[in-house]
C-alpha cells in the first residue's frame, strides 16, 4: 500500500458520500501497514495492528467502505458475515475457516501475479503448439544427412511457418478448428456437509493432481486453443512452492479481514438459553484477533499481524455488550452518521457510476434517452428521506427501492419507444410516487 492516507480518502470519496471519520480511520490503518513494513524485523514484530470497529445504522456506507477497500488494499482481503459462523463443535463453519479463506485469496492473488510475469513466455509457447497443430512436421525420410534437394524444402517449410505465424498474430486464423492435446481436468464435483470444506478441498486437490498428468485430444477453434494452451504453459512456468510461501507471508504481514454484522452475534441483555451463533462465536473469534496459529492446507498461519475491521448497526445491542476481551481488541471506534436528504441528493449525482448514471446508461442501450433535472433529484431524495423517517430507516438502500418504483414504467416501455427520451423532473416524481409516499401503509410495503 503505497497510497497516502489523503489519497486513500480521496479514492473512497469517489464512491462514498460523507462518513469522513470512518474513511480517515481505515486510511490510517492501511498506511500503518506500509509504515510497519519499513521498520527493522525486531521492531516490526512488536507493532500490532489497531483493529477498527465501525458503528452506524444500516445503509450508511459501512459495507461499501469494505468493498472499495478491497480494491485499494493490494493485499489479501476478505469480507465475511459474522452470522455465517457457529461455535466449534456445532454443525456449521467455525471461525478458523476465515483464515483458511484468506489464505486461499492470497494464493489466488499471488498466482495471478506470477502468471502475469510469465505471460509473454507462456503465449510464445502456446503459439508454437498451435503452429505445430496447424503445420504438422514433415514426415521423416531416410536416416542421415539431408540431400541438396531437401535443404530448400526445409527453408520453404520455415517460410510457411512464418506466414502462418503472421496470420495467427493478425487474428486471421481465429475461427479455424484444430486438434490439440490439452490436460484432462476432472469433470466432477465433490459435495460435502457444512463445516467440512477443508476436507472436500483436499480431496479435490488429490483428484486434480492425479488427473493433471493425463492429457486428451480436443478439437478447438484457434483463439480458444491459444487461451487454454497459454494457461497450461503459464502453469508450467510458475513455481507453486514459491507462490505458497509468498502467499502465507503476505497473509501474516498484510492480511485484512472485514467482519460485517458483528452486532448480530452479540447476546442481548435479558436473553436466556444457549445461542450457538452468538457469544460462543465471539469467544472463538477472540484467539484469531488476539493472535494465534491456524493450520491451513498451505501451512501454518500466525494471525498476530492481521488487521481486523468489524462493523455493525448496533440498533438493538450496544458495543459494550460484546465480550470484554473482544471489546479491548478493537481499540479504534468510529461512528458513522445517519444520512440526510442532502446526502441523498449527493449520492444520486456525485459518486462514480451513481444511480442516475446507471439507469441512464442502461436505457441508452435501447436507444432511449433518460435525464434528470435538479428539482427531480431533490424531490426523489426528499421522498426517500421521508419514507426512511416514517418507517424503517434503511439508509441509502431506500434510493434503490424508490428508483426502481419510479422508473418501472419507463424501463418496461423503453424497448417500444426507441429514439424517444424522457426527463425526470419534480412533477414526474410526484405523479409516480407522491400517493405511495404519503400513504404510510402503502409506503411501508411498497417503498
From Swiss-Prot:
A Pfam family = AAA_2
* Keyword Cytoplasm part of the UniProt annotation: yes
Report biased composition (Basic and acidic residues) as residue ranges.
148-159
Identify the stretch(es) annotated as Disordered. 136-160
Sorted alphabetically, the Gene Ontology BP terms of this entry are:
protein unfolding; proteolysis involved in protein catabolic process
Q: Which GO terms describe its molecular function?
A: ATP binding; ATP hydrolysis activity; peptidase activity; proteasome-activating activity
Specify which residues bind ATP according to the UniProt entry for this protein.
17, 59-64, 260, 325, 397
By its UniProt entry, which InterPro entries does this protein fall under?
Answer: AAA+_ATPase (IPR003593), ATP-dep_Clp_protease_ClpX (IPR050052), ATPase_AAA_core (IPR003959), Clp_ATPase_C (IPR019489), HslU (IPR004491), P-loop_NTPase (IPR027417)
The protein's UniProt keywords, in alphabetical order, are: ATP-binding, Chaperone, Cytoplasm, Nucleotide-binding, Stress response
Q: Please give the GO cellular component terms listed in this UniProt entry.
A: HslUV protease complex
Q: What is its main location?
A: cytoplasm
Extract the SMART domains matched here. AAA (SM00382), ClpB_D2-small (SM01086)
Subcellular location(s) of the protein: Cytoplasm
PANTHER family xrefs:
ATP-DEPENDENT CLP PROTEASE ATP-BINDING SUBUNIT CLPX-LIKE, MITOCHONDRIAL-RELATED, ATP-DEPENDENT PROTEASE ATPASE SUBUNIT HSLU
What is the stated purpose of this protein?
ATPase subunit of a proteasome-like degradation complex; this subunit has chaperone activity. The binding of ATP and its subsequent hydrolysis by HslU are essential for unfolding of protein substrates subsequently hydrolyzed by HslV. HslU recognizes the N-terminal part of its protein substrates and unfolds these before they are guided to HslV for hydrolysis.
According to the record's subunit comment, the protein's assembly and interactions are:
A double ring-shaped homohexamer of HslV is capped on each side by a ring-shaped HslU homohexamer. The assembly of the HslU/HslV complex is dependent on binding of ATP.
Concerning its family, UniProt says: Belongs to the ClpX chaperone family. HslU subfamily.
Q: What is this protein called?
A: ATP-dependent protease ATPase subunit HslU
What is the native source organism of this protein?
Coxiella burnetii (strain RSA 331 / Henzerling II)
Amino acid at each position: 500500500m503505497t497510497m497516502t492516507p489523503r489519497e486513500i480518502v480521496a479514492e473512497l470519496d469517489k464512491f462514498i458520500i460523507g462518513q469522513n471519520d470512518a474513511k480517515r480511520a481505515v486510511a490510517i490503518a492501511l498506511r500503518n501497514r506500509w509504515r510497519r513494513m519499513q521498520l527493522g524485523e525486531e521492531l516490526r514484530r512488536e507493532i500490532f495492528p489497531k483493529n477498527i470497529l465501525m458503528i452506524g445504522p444500516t445503509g450508511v456506507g459501512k459495507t461499501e467502505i469494505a468493498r472499495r477497500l478491497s480494491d485499494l488494499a493490494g493485499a489479501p482481503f476478505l469480507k465475511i458475515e459474522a452470522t455465517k459462523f457457529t461455535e466449534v463443535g456445532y454443525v456449521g463453519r467455525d471461525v478458523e475457516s476465515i483464515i483458511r479463506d484468506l489464505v486461499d485469496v492470497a494464493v489466488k492473488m499471488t498466482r495471478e501475479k506470477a502468471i502475469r510475469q510469465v505471460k509473454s513466455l507462456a503465449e510464445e509457447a502456446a503459439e508454437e503448439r498451435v503452429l505445430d497443430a496447424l503445420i504438422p512436421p514433415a514426415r521423416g525420410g531416410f536416416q542421415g544427412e539431408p540431400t541438396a534437394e531437401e535443404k530448400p524444402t526445409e527453408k520453404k517449410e520455415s517460410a510457411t511457418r512464418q506466414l502462418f505465424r503472421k496470420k495467427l498474430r493478425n487474428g486471421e486464423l481465429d475461427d479455424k478448428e484444430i486438434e490439440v492435446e490439452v490436460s484432462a481436468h476432472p469433470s466432477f464435483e465433490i459435495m460435502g456437509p457444512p463445516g467440512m470444506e477443508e476436507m472436500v478441498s483436499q480431496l479435490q486437490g488429490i483428484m486434480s493432481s492425479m488427473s493433471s498428468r493425463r492429457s486428451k485430444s480436443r478439437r478447438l477453434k484457434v483463439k480458444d486453443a491459444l487461451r487454454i494452451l497459454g494457461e497450461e504453459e503459464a502453469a508450467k512456468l510458475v513455481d507453486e512452492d514459491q507462490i505458497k510461501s509468498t502467499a502465507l507471508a503476505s497473509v501474516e504481514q498484510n492480511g485484512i479481514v472485514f467482519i460485517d454484522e458483528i452486532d448480530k452475534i452479540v447476546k442481548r441483555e435479558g436473553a436466556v438459553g444457549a445461542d450457538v451463533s452468538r457469544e460462543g462465536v465471539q469467544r472463538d473469534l477472540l484467539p484469531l484477533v488476539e493472535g494465534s496459529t491456524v493450520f491451513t492446507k498451505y501451512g501454518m498461519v500466525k494471525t498476530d499481524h492481521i488487521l481486523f475491521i468489524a462493523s455493525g448497526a448496533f440498533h438493538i445491542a450496544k458495543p459494550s455488550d460484546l465480550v470484554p476481551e473482544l471489546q479491548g481488541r478493537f481499540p479504534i471506534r468510529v461512528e458513522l452518521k445517519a444520512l440526510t436528504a442532502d446526502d441523498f441528493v449527493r449520492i444520486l449525482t456525485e459518486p462514480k457510476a451513481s444511480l442516475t448514471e446507471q439507469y441512464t446508461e442502461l436505457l441508452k442501450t435501447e436507444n432511449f434517452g433518460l435525464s434528470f433535472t435538479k428539482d427531480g433529484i431533490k424531490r426523489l431524495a426528499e421522498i426517500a428521506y421521508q419514507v426512511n423517517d416514517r418507517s424503517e430507516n434503511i439508509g441509502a438502500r431506500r434510493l434503490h427501492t424508490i428508483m426502481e418504483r419510479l422508473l418501472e414504467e419507463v424501463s418496461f416501455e423503453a424497448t417500444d419507444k426507441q429514439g424517444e427520451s424522457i426527463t425526470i423532473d419534480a412533477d414526474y416524481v410526484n405523479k409516480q410516487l407522491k400517493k405511495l409516499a404519503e400513504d404510510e401503509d402503502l409506503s411501508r410495503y411498497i417503498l
